[in-house]
Amino acid sequence: MIPFNAPPVVGTELDYMQSAMGSGKLCGDGGFTRRCQQWLEQRFGSAKVLLTPSCTASLEMAALLLDIQPGDEVIMPSYTFVSTANAFVLRGAKIVFVDVRPDTMNIDETLIEAAITDKTRVIVPVHYAGVACEMDTIMALAKKHNLFVVEDAAQGVMSTYKGRALGTIGHIGCFSFHETKNYTAGGEGGATLINDKALIERAEIIREKGTNRSQFFRGQVDKYTWRDIGSSYLMSDLQAAYLWAQLEAADRINQQRLALWQNYYDALAPLAKAGRIELPSIPDGCVQNAHMFYIKLRDIDDRSALINFLKEAEIMAVFHYIPLHGCPAGEHFGEFHGEDRYTTKESERLLRLPLFYNLSPVNQRTVIATLLNYFS
């Protein structure tokens, strides 16, 4: 079976993990954590990066940091992972879902302003497949209405929008280092990017169980105490060691994934030209990271038939999110603003093909040949 995904392995992970084990410190904020955070800050230009156990934890941390209260409204696309919404629902917020653009599956920036009320606190753009949302428009809306922007850049590590790294444009950005992402911290992991310097001190406190422990270890206070609400949002240094190996090889991983993505695009372009499928669209000003390669079929039946055909050929291809507004929790905790013109329809057409760092050329050729055979 050719899997849909396999965690990236570059070969130096075990060496760094053994080094972490020999250091005598495996908990959070060890040497490898500091290396990773500094690398991310310097590479992407964020004021402060804090490693977390997951992107889910980063989103929850953002909701705490922005002091989301019951009754507040948070705008986001319905076509996203449940964590995007859960983080704010946990604080009592109401989720306001907005339709997506069919070209990128990102939130339609032209529909956001109509969804803003006097209760709106946050806009959460989700950079689907590592392709940027229209951030200039979103940030202008946030400034006009005095709102915060939390970028769900779970899939966006190494992607840019008009030269700026995804996750560094909004007030807060959230990365994922889950094993399904381009870079992993040994299976699970995330990072919170604090781009508004006024939020840094409280972010450190919330991440450290509500204490000023970070200031204590920097020698800024003689003891640390309970200062605020918080939780334990630290990644273990053993996981950070795994992540460090991946970040050292980040450019190599990125180039390999982009090459695999382009192979698919070039091979399937004739099918798109013939109108049989649709291929991903990368808007001007966006540089993507080849997080995924998807095609769009005619409808859900067409997609199901192809999934079954590929499965019989020992190839795993998968659809993606069930739109949140149609789920029981989505109906309870949120509402869809305006018309669902594209979210549901486009989600039922989308199929993701195998794409991961260690995908062999022969296996990718097999996937392509099988697809071409199906459509012939």
From Swiss-Prot:
Subunit structure: Homotetramer.
Reactions this protein catalyses: dTDP-4-amino-4,6-dideoxy-alpha-D-galactose + 2-oxoglutarate = dTDP-4-dehydro-6-deoxy-alpha-D-glucose + L-glutamate
Catalytic temperature dependence: Optimum temperature is 37 degrees Celsius.
Listed Pfam families: DegT_DnrJ_EryC1
Deletion phenotype: Mutants do not synthesize TDP-Fuc4NAc and enterobacterial common antigen (ECA).
Modification N6-(pyridoxal phosphate)lysine, positions: 181
pH dependence of function: Optimum pH is 7.5.
Necessary cofactors: pyridoxal 5'-phosphate
PANTHER family named in the record: DTDP-4-AMINO-4,6-DIDEOXYGALACTOSE TRANSAMINASE, TRANSAMINASE
Family named by the database record: Belongs to the DegT/DnrJ/EryC1 family.
Enzyme Commission number(s) from the entry: 2.6.1.59
Function summary: Catalyzes the synthesis of dTDP-4-amino-4,6-dideoxy-D-galactose (dTDP-Fuc4N) from dTDP-4-keto-6-deoxy-D-glucose (dTDP-D-Glc4O) and L-glutamate.
Protein's UniProt name: dTDP-4-amino-4,6-dideoxygalactose transaminase
